[in-house]
């Protein structure tokens, strides 16, 4: 079978797969054949993947209550990278969440990279996530690597078919025994200042006038 264009954005190499033999089929007049077009996201499977994640979130929170939100970026095939925000309360909690996520559902075992952040981070904003990774993660302490784990057979980046590594990034604030240093204080405007700026925004930054309307 193959080559076949897949949701990864690559053609799968021809290979041997089980044979399906159809003896007969009945169809009505003017029948509609329903299918999806796969390829590099955004595509139809990525939209379905985002909807399915919303279905699975209650199950995630039931098993891992500290999870506030989870996102599977469509750019990462909708399952190979996960960004998870948690309400952190104790040291080592991010690693517990990583292991729990990989173990919860068979599909989640195919996720290669899990990034865990605090609940003040917008997990759907890459600038926010990258800021957390850059300021709350130390590579010598906050990476958890696992090898020879189940992986997507379509992932030709893995050294062996069906077996590959996983990486967890703890991009949360470090508390308790996770650090011996005083944690930095973040720069934030007060709610009152934000309100005043919002009220006077157009005064500070007037919109250019459209001369064509004169």
Regions found by a protein language model. Give the residues of each.
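Charged, compositionally biased interaction regions
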Residues: 1-214
